Amino acid sequence: MSVYRLFTVSIMDMCVLKANCKDPLGFTVEYTCVFGISSPIPGLHGGEHVNSYGEGVCVITFHNKDGRVFWFIIEKLPKKYTYPISPRFTPQDASEFCGRLADVHVFNDVTVGHLWRNRTVVSMNALEEGLLSTWSFERMVLLGDSVHKMTPNIGQGANTAIEDAAALASLIHQMINPMTPQNASKAAIGHLFQKFQDLRMSRVQSTVQRAHFGARFHTRDDHLKALVGRYIFPYVGNLVMARTVKVIGGGHKIEFLPPPKRSMPWTAQTDHSQHKMHGSKVLWAYLSHPDQHWSDDPRGTAQLRSQSLGTHRTSTVGRTLFIELVIVMIDVVYARQDIGEDVNAGVKDMAVQSRNSMRFLPYVLSYGSTESLLAAGWRQVWVFRLLSYLFGALLGL
């Protein structure tokens, strides 16, 4: 638990706080993580990011431009803990943990053993998860991990804390701005803190839910997640990345400072309708040109590699049909997590996404039939691609 949150809660208790404070210890632990930094490893290239999914364990790596590898190995614990009861780990625990998983593949021939042997920094911690309903008391306010904690699977823990700070700074600046002076009384400050929580709660709740789902999806927590993670996600990495970027783009910024110049403009300045591609369109493009990278935004993509342990990309009719049909489920899973701000940023609701996915089913069948001909010996690939374009045009893709 954060020292600051513990201190605030103790003051609340001493003052016999009458406000709603039902969850002062509301964090749970279901996963553990070994975090490390390693020197460059052959096969893991700078600027790339790898997600490797397995049974009960996943490996996430980020590689900087100099080749250094930042990595997380996340494993589900045998039991669930509720704070303040939480497991603690030593360097010896981390060594035994990585030794037990040394042969687990990260990407191609790279294994956990390579990460461990090249380590320069390593630590092992329990991963707390949760979102508290009370963020402030009188003139004290909490933000970041002190009120919302998540696993690192979607990489938004620190970003969410930074967004908290930006939103709070903007509200404080608004209060003390000489052009619009406001009374900084105890009541006014309490109102400001409540406004801050109300402003952030919806987005933070969505982010915590996405991280919660991500941890369980990456570790194949049930049969459905295992099915999609093993046979679908290795083929739609850019689609996932594009949607993730769209969600991140809706973050709160410091309102009284101009946005820095970047290659990508701020979300509020971007017309998403100019470069929107639905999931079915991305797959159609991928199937027509499997050697290309595809993204929602034509201005460029990052290199993301997704690997499901034990999966090999063999071109079969059954695999193709299966991948195309399950895209309906992928759209629905993402749409179920949409909130108001996502819709405003250009993410369609579940009904529209499902309808667009179902429109894609006729093309699925046509593609499968065409690949059957190819498998039977009809090797004129240009004919296959012509048919792909034709069916795509007929369906308005």
UniProtKB/Swiss-Prot annotation:
Active site: 53
Binding annotation for FAD: 145, 158
Domain of life, source organism: Eukaryota
Cofactor(s) essential for the protein: FAD
Enzyme nomenclature, EC number: 1.-.-.-
Pathway(s) it belongs to: Secondary metabolite biosynthesis; terpenoid biosynthesis
Keywords: FAD, Flavoprotein, Monooxygenase, NADP, Oxidoreductase
Recorded phenotype for the gene knockout or disruption: Impairs the synthesis of terretonin but accumulates dimethylorsellinate through the decomposition of an unstable intermediate.
One BP term from GO: terpenoid biosynthetic process
Molecular function terms from GO: FAD binding; monooxygenase activity
Enzyme class: oxidoreductase
Biological function: FAD-dependent monooxygenase; part of the gene cluster that mediates the biosynthesis of terretonin, a fungal meroterpenoid that acts as a mycotoxin. The first step of the pathway is the synthesis of 3,5-dimethylorsellinic acid (DMOA) by the polyketide synthase trt4. DMOA is then prenylated into farnesyl-DMOA by the polyprenyl transferase trt2. Methylation by the methyltransferase trt5 then leads to farnesyl-DMOA methyl ester which is further subject to epoxidation by the FAD-dependent monooxygenase trt8 to yield epoxyfarnesyl-DMOA methyl ester.
Record family assignment: Belongs to the paxM FAD-dependent monooxygenase family.
Protein name: FAD-dependent monooxygenase trt8
Source organism: Aspergillus terreus (strain NIH 2624 / FGSC A1156)
Lineage of origin: Eukaryota, Fungi, Dikarya, Ascomycota, Pezizomycotina
Gene it is expressed from: trt8
